[in-house]
C-alpha cells in the first residue's frame, strides 16, 4: 500500500488544503512530516528570490499527478530507495546552496529550462520505477511487514470506533475465546438488525440533547429520568498484574460504607419502603438498586426492575479503573470480595433482562464478559448458560470453537448442556445452504458422532426431553432398559439437577421436526450399540457414579439465580434451608472482608412487633448476650433465618384481615351484652 493510501486512511488527503500560486511545488525532504506540510503560499504569481531555496517551480499543475505517484513509489515501508535525484533538481539545489540567487534568469529562458527539466526528470523517474518493479522479489519481506502494520492500524481504528466489517473476525478476536466486542454490548445494535434503525431510535432522537452526562459508557445509556449522577463513593483499584492478567477490586469509602450499613438494616426490617428512603439519599447505591429491582420484578413491574438494574450498572461503570478493560479478557475480579459481587450480579440480571427482551446476541456478550472476570473459578457457573445463548443467537461457530479450545482442560463434554448443545450446533450448521458441500457433510457426521456419545453418557435426558417436546417415543425406545424409567431414577442427584436445569431452559430448541428425526436416527444407533455390548456403555456408567456425587456451590448459586422451578426443586436440603438474599445469594465460605459491619447496640428496637415475634420463634434466635459473644466475626451468618422469616410474615399477613374482627358499638363500649 502506498503512502498516499495511508494518508487517506488517516484522513490526511492531499488537495483538501487551500492552494496558492506557490503551493504547487514538488519538494523532496528527509522528513515525512515536512513533506506533507508543504510551503506557505506566496503573494504573487512569480516565485520570489528566497523561495527558490525550497523547491522547483512548476508551471503546469497537472504534471504533479504523475509526480506524486512517482514520489510514492520511491518510498518502501517508510524508507526511501537508493535512487538518485534528477540531475536538474540536484544541480539546482547545489547551485542555490553555493551561489544563492546567482541562478536567476529571464522569464522566457526559465520557462524553456523548466519544461526541459520536467521532461528529463519524469523520464528518469520512470526508468527508476521500472527498475523497482524488477526488484520486487528483494523487497517482499519488507512489503509483508508493511501490510501487517496496516492491519494493526485498521484493527486500532475498528476498536476505537466500535465498528467491524463483516467477514472473518479480526486478529484481536482470535486471541482469546472470551473476547468481547463493544458494539454487541448495546442491545440497540441487535434491535436495529431486527426492526430497523427508525423503529428503534425514532423516539430517542428528540431526547438526545435534553441533558449532558459526564461520561460515555459502554454497558448502558443514562436516561433523563434518572437522578443527577454524583460520585457515590464507589471506586476501583488495581491490586496486581502478573502473567499478563490484571486483578482489580471495587472499593467503598466511608460514605458508601455508611450507606451499606443502612441498607443491611433496611433488609433486616423486611420493609421495602426503607430501601426506597435510602435511595432518596443515595440514588446510586448498587445493592439497594438490586434489592428493589427484585421487589419490582416479583410485583411484575418489569420496566421499573430493568431501569433499576441499568442504573446500578451505570454507577459501577463510572467507577471503573482507567486500565480496566471489558473486551480484553485479561481483567479479573475476585468474587470472594463482597464489593465485587455486586458487579457480577448486576451483569447477570442485565443479561437475563436482555434475553427476555429478545436480544440473545447481546446477552451472549454479557455472558462472555461475566465468564472472563474469573474463568477458572466461574462463581456464577456461566458455562451452564453460554451454550444456550449461543444457540439462541445462532452463533454456532462460537459454541463449537469454545468447545474445541476448552474441552482439553475443562472437560466440557461432562456437562449435559454442552454434551447435547454442541452436536445440535453442528447439526444446525449442516442445515445452512451457504456452506460448501464437504463442510456440510463433515458437520453432519460430527453432529451424529457427538449426539451418540451424549446419549450414551446421559441416557436419562432422552425421555424427559421428549416429554417436554410433546413427542411420544416408539415402543422399542420406551420399553428398552437403557432409556426406560430406570435411566432417570438411577442417575445421581447432582446429575439430575444439571439435567433439570438444561431441559427447563433449552428444551424448546429441540422441537423442530428435522431435529427430532435426526435425534431418532441416532437413538436407534445407540440402542444397537447397547445391545451389541459396546464397552463404552459400561465405561460411561462407571464415570457417572464417580463424577456426580455432589454439585459444587457455584452450581447451586447458578440454579438459584436461574429461577427454573424444576432445577430449584432439585436443590439439596442443606441449600434450601439457608438464608438466600437477592443481593448476595450463597456467599463463598472463604469471603474476604475489607471492612466489617459495626455492632448494633439495640437491634430489637429496629424491628416491628410482628417481625420480632417471628424472629423469637426461629431456631437461630439469639439474645443480646449471645450476640455480644459472637462479635463482629459472625458477619457471614447475620442473615440466617431472614428468608424463612419473610415467608412466615407474608403467609401471616395474607391470612390476617382486620375486617374479620367485630368492632364494638358505641352504646356498649365495654362489650357487655345479654346472654339470652
Swiss-Prot record:
Annotated knockout phenotype: Knockout does not lead to differences in heart size under standard conditions, however in a mouse model of cardiac hypertrophy induced by pressure overload following aortic banding surgery, heart size is increased.
Composition bias, Polar residues: 113-122
Alphabetized GO MF terms: DNA binding
Residues the record lists as Phosphoserine modifications: 602
Disulfide bonds: none
Keywords: Cytoplasm, Nucleus, Phosphoprotein, Repressor, Transcription, Transcription regulation
Location within or outside the cell: Nucleus; Cytoplasm, Cytosol
One Gene Ontology CC term in the entry: cytosol
Pfam families cross-referenced by the UniProt entry: Tcf25 (PF04910)
Tissue: Broadly expressed in the embryo during the early stages of organogenesis with highest levels in dorsal root ganglia and little or no expression in liver and skin.
One GO BP: rescue of stalled ribosome
Biased composition (Gly residues): 41-53
Region called Disordered, residue ranges: 1-145
Biased composition (Basic residues): 124-136
Subunit architecture: Component of the ribosome quality control complex (RQC), composed of the E3 ubiquitin ligase LTN1, TCF25 and NEMF associated with the 60S ribosomal subunit. Interacts (via C-terminus) with NFATC4; the interaction leads to suppresson of NFATC4 transcription factor activity and is reduced following stimulation with angiotensin-2. Interacts with XIAP.
Family according to the record: Belongs to the TCF25 family.
PANTHER family (alphabetical): NULP1-RELATED, RIBOSOME QUALITY CONTROL COMPLEX SUBUNIT TCF25
Physiological role: Component of the ribosome quality control complex (RQC), a ribosome-associated complex that mediates ubiquitination and extraction of incompletely synthesized nascent chains for proteasomal degradation. In the RQC complex, required to promote formation of 'Lys-48'-linked polyubiquitin chains during ubiquitination of incompletely synthesized proteins by LTN1. May negatively regulate the calcineurin-NFAT signaling cascade by suppressing the activity of transcription factor NFATC4. May play a role in cell death control.
Protein name (record): Ribosome quality control complex subunit TCF25
Species of origin: Mus musculus
Gene behind the chain: Tcf25
